């Protein structure tokens, strides 16, 4: 892959253990990411803020005060939540960044059709002044076991291009999935415009599903427990 792909280091599997978060910070990841608001709080309170903190799921409405206070950027796929998030960011006098998610068959999250995603992008860009549209993304290999392919990655790239044409500027990020997208990035089949991946499993365990690169260590974590 000839372009730079940034990494969001996902720490939910280790409960945002400060020692591991610090390693991620030092490794040069773009974001520290988790799906747990409680873990965002742990990192904030521990001063682990060298990198922007990312929430990698759509939040509940009741969580929005914490989402704005504790994270810098979040994945979003519902216009009602986006509008409420904007109001909360306004109350806290903050600009919160969002990545709009597109569902490409996995059914975990995201707008189901491109028209809805385009409408949401235009509303964020032009009307929701306390939100900043940072990019678009997709989640795969989760609920529906739809794996990353050149075809669905290109569909995401096409959506990004359509949004960029409508808003008149380039998006910062086109996020092409998580650990299961690593093989495409490493074997040169990832479309050029994909520039952010969210790595949890492959960063911690050195492998993901059936993909196990030789250059990644598989023994960096040891679980110790007392047997009763």
Question: What is each model feature region?
Answer:
Residues 3-7, 28-31, 49-53, 71-72, ...:
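Short, well-ordered coil/turn segments that N-cap beta-strands
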Residues 64-107:
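A generic, well-ordered mixed alpha/beta core segment in the N-terminal half of proteins
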């Amino acid at each position: 892959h000839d372009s730079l792909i940034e990494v969001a280091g996902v720490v939910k599997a280790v409960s945002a253990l400060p020692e591991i978060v610090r390693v991620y910070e030092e490794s040069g990841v773009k974001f520290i990411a988790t799906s747990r608001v409680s873990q965002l709080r742990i990192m904030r309170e521990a001063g682990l803020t060298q990198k922007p903190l990312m929430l990698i799921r759509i939040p509940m409405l009741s969580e929005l005060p914490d989402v704005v206070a504790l994270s810098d950027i979040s994945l979003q796929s519902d216009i009602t939540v986006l509008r409420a998030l904007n109001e909360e960011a306004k109350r806290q006098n903050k600009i919160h960044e969002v990545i709009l998610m597109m569902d490409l068959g996995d059914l975990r999250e995201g707008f189901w059709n491109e028209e809805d995603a385009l409408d949401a992008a235009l509303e964020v860009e032009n009307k929701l002044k306390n939100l900043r549209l940072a990019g678009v993304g997709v989640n795969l290999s989760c609920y529906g076991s739809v794996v990353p392919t050149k075809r669905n990655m290109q569909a995401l790239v096409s959506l990004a291009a359509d949004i960029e044409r409508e808003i008149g500027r380039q998006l910062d990020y086109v996020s092409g999935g998580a650990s299961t997208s690593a093989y495409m990035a490493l074997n040169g089949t990832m479309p050029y415009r994909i520039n952010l991946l969210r790595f949890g499993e492959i960063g911690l365990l050195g492998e993901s599903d059936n993909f196990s690169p030789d250059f990644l260590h598989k023994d960096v974590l040891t679980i110790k427990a007392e047997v009763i």
